[in-house]
Amino acid sequence: MLFLLLFFLAVLIAAEVYSIYKGMDKITYDAQASQSLLEPNEEFTITTKIGHYKFWFLPYLEMVENFPDQLQFPHDEDIVVDRMHSNLSPELCLTRLHSTFYLMPNQAFYRSVDVSLPKRGRYLLQDATLYGGDFLGIRDNCNKFKIHKEIIVMPERISYPNLDHLLGDFLGNISVRRFLFDDPMLTVGFSEYTGREPMRDISWTQSARMGKMMVKEYDHTIDYCVEVLVNVQSVPNSFESEDEGVETCFSLARGVCEVLESKQMKYGFSTNAITLGPIGSLCSVDQGIGNRHFFRVMEILGRALPQSAEYFNATLSRACRSIQTGKHFIIITPKVDPSWEESLHRLQESTVAQVIVLTPDSFQTSDSEQKEEAV
């Protein structure tokens, strides 16, 4: 009897020692968002996985996950959440999500929660802490897990009734040049006439040789496009900006890009805003069109801060150096300062293309004029 008691005591001590030093080994943590690029207030799902890859039974675990401070839970009202606020740094403001569960040997625990984010910006899923007791419940152990998952919220879509009107003449002139006036500088080949080509493209010499109607294939050296340039500097000789005006500019940039997409007009994008993440401090996207191109621009706008990486005059100088035939400019800025007028004039003079400047005040003025006409 004493032998069995000693044996049981030895097993108990061994299990306790093992649980203290090895009990929470081979546990993995991961959190994944169902979407990485979102609309403001769009619901998405964060799925958490805890993997347990050993024979040991874990009867009680508590998980504390650190999520972005502005995370909202529209449906799950029974989850345990506490929010940490700090006036020192926004990064110290967190939403802490608590969960308790147990894990059988070689078992994975999954937990999904529907959430949303209300404002434009870059948010991170960063870390979690897992607490578990030892075999006898005498002391607690903990594992800390680090991850780096980004969630980007695009600028808010704002309806600008006068946007088509303001851009109408600008885009109309480009469309006329693009679709009505070809610039065939080099003939690269010939193809059979299908009936859809204009009569002026028929090559009578090649048609006589081949015994059938042949049309010329051109290398069009002019590719008309629009460069959308977003400035966030609103105070001269300062990198700081007014947040509200800059946020309006980001939404306005989105509206401009949507109009260009609807018109099937190729466009590029650049901004002097500082952007968070791996993209870099100065961001630009080459000309293109389509969903992939559009969402690439939206990602940059979502990452952007209301702080400029360079003065607007330097941004305009870079634009002057990138001038090419057929390139037009839509400049979006919180306001137009007199110190920038010389650079804007230089950009206009350095190209035969058109330059249009849009500010939030442009739409406020247009709206007030419409109200006066209605009265």
Give names to the regions the model predicted.
Residues 59, 186, 200, 290-297, ...:
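Alpha-helical structural motif
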Residues 98-101, 151, 285-287, 296, ...:
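Generic detection of short hydrophobic beta-strand segments and adjacent strand-loop junctions
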Residues 271-300:
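Short beta-strand-loop
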Residues 179, 193, 242, 286, ...:
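Generic alpha-helical structural element
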Residues 218-220, 259-261, 288-292, 320-322:
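Short, conserved, surface-exposed binding loops centered on an aromatic residue
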Residues 240-245, 284-289, 302-307:
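Short, contiguous acidic/charged loop-to-helix segments that flank catalytic cores in large enzymes
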Residues 1-22, 26-27, 45-47, 70, ...:
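Von Willebrand factor type A / integrin I
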